[in-house]
Amino acid sequence: MKITVINGTEKHGVTYSMKEIFLEQFRDDSEITEYYLPKDGPGFCTGCTACFRNNQNLCKDAEKVQKIEKSLLEADLLVFASPAYVFHTTGAMKAMLDHFGYRWMPHRPAKEMFGKRAVIITQCLGAGGRSTAKDIKDSLSWWGISTIKVVSFKLMSEIDWNKIEDKRKASIQKKLSSVAKKFHVIDYNKPGNTNVIVKAKFYIVRMLQTSLGKKNPEYTDFKYWNENGWIGKVRPWK
């Protein structure tokens, strides 16, 4: 199987250690591709809207964005790891996710995403882990992903992995290993189920695209939906 990992920071600290524990289950039989932000990611989105109005390849950071997207689309499992920075994901992670706005449901979602599975790993000192995960989960859901597992930890102690008590480390390792085992035994030849929330988003946007298409048949997003057959009876999860 193929796994693509997006690391919200280049630092090899607590979040990195947690991510490594999770990946241990997959090392022997998986092809793992990792990106460390910000060095492997795009710069800040400038809001030029070229990806929305015309083509994503017109983005100033298209080379890096398309490289990451290729890995995401080819992967069976997506892993996102981010510490909490002031109750949110890292700026580098947010910058990367912004560049995939054109893949949100109201625009041009990739049909491959509807069957994907994802794991989000976050950690914080006391609070902010869940809101950090939500920053990432919002994008994944609007990309069309339904199976999203959030694993979040409150350290309530040291922020240096080497200084965390062994008992706490063991607890963290046990939880991450348990989640990893569940995802390791999945038959990835079968796409994940698409839940009601994602389907609802799809049908609401479908009505919007149908309306926009009547006004302007050359509208970029409508043409994409129409070419995929989604305005008709074709569905990306079937």
Task: Label every model-predicted segment.
Residues M1-P109, A170-K238:
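N-terminal beta1-alpha1-beta2 submodule of the flavodoxin-like/Rossmannoid cofactor-binding fold
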Residues I6, F80, I120, D160-K163:
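Short coil/turn segments at secondary-structure junctions
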Residues P109-S152:
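Short, glycine-/small-residue-rich phosphate/pyrophosphate-handling segment
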Residues G91, G129-K134, N162-K163:
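A short secondary-structure junction signal
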Residues K154-I159:
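Active-site rim beta-loop-alpha module in soluble metabolic enzymes
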